[in-house]
Curated annotation (Swiss-Prot):
Its cofactor is Fe cation. It is a multi-pass membrane protein. This is Methylsterol monooxygenase 1. A motif (Histidine box-2) lies at residues 170-174. Residues 145-274 form the Fatty acid hydroxylase domain. One of its GO terms (biological process) is sterol biosynthetic process. The chain crosses the membrane at residues 55-75, 100-120, 199-219. Its EC number is 1.14.18.9. Its main location: endoplasmic reticulum.
Length: 296
């Protein structure tokens, strides 16, 4: 009975969104996107689309999303939003990070990306324009992927902090006490495989089109680069996402090494009490700010 009620609620929500969508003006980008998509299908094989298309989406998204944070270090005005202003980025650290990223991207991630075609074939994931989900379905699927990945990340990330294995794998990612955007995927190859596995679970559960794979890549990179940016920017649209952790939450993890293990949302740390030191730290910050206001 409860299952039927849940299904009815979801169906009603879907119909409500479809009804609202029918009143929205036509998207002027839809036709050019459709033409480009069909051109891609007509001129490239599924293997080329799944492999080189996925690589292009990942690399372009990753480095383009890193650009704002990279530029911020040269803008004095933005320094007031830097979470750890006493630990600026250095060229030496950024160059070291970049070299490791290139190695991981092309020697660890590329072989995995080469399996994307076989992944889509095994699960019968379509490529055709006619099978593409509506924007609100795609958005909901990406959110579902984020919820699943966040749960995987919390428990496996916490395991990687165990004293018996931390120094062998996860210590690499913690070389930078004050993170910066490009450092988001700076990790030991084993960590890339272990934590990266959570990315694909949601795809297996929700994926009904290859476009979700690419949309989820972009969403996941947007989130992980944001939380590693080192800047708590006001009016950040990602803060509109319910229970979103954000840069300040994850920055504390790099600064403190303990707690705040989740990747995207705050609920797992709240449930298991692993955000207690972060909460105490925020309270201490508030008291310091109040004292400063009184003295001024």
């Amino acid at each position: 009975m409860a299952v039927n009620d849940s299904v009815n609620i979801l169906n009603s929500a879907y119909l409500a969104v479809e009804y609202i969508d029918s009143f929205l003006p036509d998207n002027p980008l839809q036709q050019p996107f459709k033409n480009a998509w069909n051109y891609m299908l007509d001129n490239y094989t599924k293997f080329q689309i799944a492999t080189w298309g996925s690589l292009l989406v990942h690399e372009a998204s990753y480095f383009l999303l890193c650009v704002p944070g990279f530029i911020f270090q040269f803008i004095p005005y933005m320094q007031k939003y830097k979470i750890q202003p006493d630990k600026p980025e250095t060229w030496e650290k950024q160059w070291k990070c970049f070299k490791t990223l290139i190695f991981n991207h092309f020697f660890i991630q590329l072989p995995l990306i080469c399996g994307t075609y076989y992944f889509t074939e095994y699960f019968n994931i379509p490529y055709e324009w006619e099978e593409m989900p509506r924007w609100y379905v795609l958005l909901a699927q990406c959110f579902g992927c984020a919820v699943i990945e966040d749960a995987w990340h919390y428990f496996l990330h916490r395991l990687l902090h165990h004293k018996r294995i931390y120094k062998y794998i996860h210590k690499v990612h913690h070389e930078f006490v004050s993170p910066f955007g490009m450092q988001a995927e700076y990790a030991h190859p084993l960590e890339t495989l272990i934590l990266g596995a959570g990315f694909f679970i949601g795809i297996v559960v929700f994926c009904n089109h290859v476009v979700l794979l690419w949309a989820w890549v972009i969403c996941r990179l947007m989130e992980t680069i944001d939380v590693h940016s080192g800047y708590d920017i006001p009016l950040n649209p990602l803060h509109l996402v319910p229970f979103y952790a954000g840069a300040r939450f994850h920055d504390f993890h790099h600064m403190n090494f303990i707690g705040n293990y989740a990747s995207t949302f705050t609920w797992w740390d709240r449930i298991f009490g692993t955000d207690s030191q972060f909460i105490a730290y925020k309270e201490k910050e508030k008291k310091q700010q109040l004292r400063m206001k009184k003295t001024n």
